[in-house]
Amino acid sequence: MRTILTAIFGLFLTISASAKLTFREIRTAADNVIELFYVSDTLDVNEVDISDPAQWKVNGQPALAVNRIAAAADQCDNFIYLTVPTLENGKKYTIDTPYGSYKFKFNDKEVFCEAIKTNQVAYSALSTKRFANMAIYLGDGGTRKIEGALPGYTVYKLKKSGKVGKKICSGQVKEIGQDRSSGDFVYRIDLSQVPEGGLYKIVVDGYGSSYPFGVGSDFSQKLAYVSFRSLFNQRCGIQIIEPYSDFSYRTKRCHETIYQTYDRIGEARLVVKGTEPTIQAWGGYHDAGDADRRTYHMDVPSTLLTTYEAFPELFTDNQFNIPDIFDEQFNILGKGNGIPDILDEAEWGTMFWKYFQEEDGQIPWGTETNGYSPFTTYDFEDHLFGSETLDPRTSAWASGLFYHFARIIKPFDEAKSAEYAARADLAYNASVRTYAERNREMPATFCMYYNVEKYLMTGDAECHEYVKAHAADAMQIVDTYNQGSEIFAERGWLTSYFFSYILAPESKTDAATVKAFKDALQATVDKQMAAFLENAYPNGTPMNVTWWGSNVAQGQYTYPIVLMWKLTGKQEYIDVVSQMMDYALGLNPLGKCFMTTLGYNQVHWPHDRESAYTIEQGWGPRPGILVFGPGNYVRNYPSYPVISRNSTPRERAYIDILDNYQNNEYTIYQSLCFPSVVYPILAGGYTSH
């Protein structure tokens, strides 16, 4: 589950360990702190005993202080911090502990220093500003400032052996100050002069070195590929098999049969008797670690379509190894249908709602079951799924999405375009009718989406008048763009609801309306740019934003900035996007990459049913899952120090364990949707077939 870079960090160790506790690595946490990393097959955060500091000796002398941190992981990770006199390059150290004796020669070019936080996967070459952070944290010893002169640093290119090679650049770390969001005393390492390529490593004088990292090139290409394909892996109603996956873990189509129960909307409480009428439906996505399909998921195809409109040159067919040729039952026949993969993915996310639509145009809110599917591949699904209630919000959103897809797909398939356009009007009329019956108006969000897309496709004058008259409504995006994505199912604004109008030819648009939409987008961008500057780490999350996954939702937060960069070409916009997207890949207080299978400090146990199966098979978790990450104050999961709402900074409130859905689950619409398009844009498209 975890990569140990012994070749790169060149530790010389003699190891003895108990049957339960296994010694893994010597690290540093400061220029006078040696860190010992143990893993245990027992989930006991008090297993490592430091109550007698005299038993922890370095070169025969008791450590000046002994601190620790422990947390549930796989099964338990334990980090012991030994404060010693200032470390000296070339000096040999013998460490005696109650759990064994270890020897190493300190070399700051070889030993890993956990205080250095980098993007462990790929910094974007499009950005002119890149950085790493540095912060000392000693578990129950708390955070620590650097005393005395600030150290220098050097960036080296690594040789194939993992040893440092050519010097790339150097400088001195810069003090940022104490950060409220993380609790850290933060220092900055400027990487702006590091050119495209890699692998590189940062060496901080007297402290140690970072994890390796790359800039652009194949590193960004791999990130783009893995991130985009997270959507494919989350598809419902399809096999996930070789050669379209590194391993075949779902050999049967799943969740095709839906029982028409029309039950109330609720989490895991829908009882299916098995005698109800059924329909067959393919497409859409599993919600998260479970398999329900929900209205919120329409933000995925909406975002994919907008991204293709804005950056068509970056997306092609046969780009992401996604099957796109099927028989009538959606058995895979091959790929290469001549349609860009991003539009194939958009169709998969859209077509479920086509199959789910009633004859009168209404659409149920989604599918649900009673309880949860077992933690294994959906080949072994043992739950029946039924439809939730018919909901006008669903048909309202679908009316805009159907027209959006119909317009974009028309050059590739006119018949399919016509079908979706007809369904769009059917959905819109059903929604208006149902809202009227309930003495309510259709939300402005969906009204705008429908009217913009229908006007751009058909030239309908009445739709255009609506768009012009209500353009100011879009300013509400400023207050909703960074909220929990459930709000997009009614009052929350997506850029997709109006951005197509901005991109349309001037001959088809009204200048005042375009300006109103651009003003709304600009105000949103300005707000997020300010939020980016609030915290020392590039998470861009205001302190009052606290929904599940909000601290790793940089894709959602940066998407309006990406679109403004498209319109203006301003370098400052892509710089901020790039820096914020570094956060989830390791440039965070925990130094953890929250996207599965990438980076060096990886997520052990995503709360994901099919990953439980792939891990059991020895393949590791399914690739590209961006878990919720830190920020939710979990209960009843072992950790030391105990995670507390009153004392633990939000960016350190994280435990990596399967059952911890607050930290280690994810959703298709919150976690995977936006990064799946932002990372390919930062890579300049994906071309490394």
Stretch-by-stretch model annotation:
Residues 6-14:
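Bacterial N-terminal signal peptides
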